[in-house]
Amino acid sequence: QFNRQLGRAAMVHACDMLENGFFDHRGSDGSNSQARVQNAGYRDCIVAENIAWGYPRSEQIVNGWMNSPGHRRNMLHPRIEEFGVGITQGPKGPYWVLVVGKQC
């Protein structure tokens, strides 16, 4: 199910990548996905993050992630219960961030 805190963490990272011109799981401040979800108030036992850039439609990004073993594993992990999504539009296409997790 959608979780607002995970969505906030995902959006923060999508905006950070766009505003600071990079594409990486590590934020411009050195943060990782676990730090970002905790800063958003999420008490995580499990957290994983998928990022993508340039895919114009959601169907394309989901297909891309499902065809990538690591991204697919994040999305289908049996203990994952919640997700959040952040999308921001850049001049060369959108930045996509999916954060999945389970609270303790």
PLM regions and their residue ranges:
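Short, surface-exposed glycine/acidic/tryptophan-bearing loops
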Residues: 4-57, 75
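Disulfide-stabilized extracellular recognition modules
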Residues: 44, 52-104
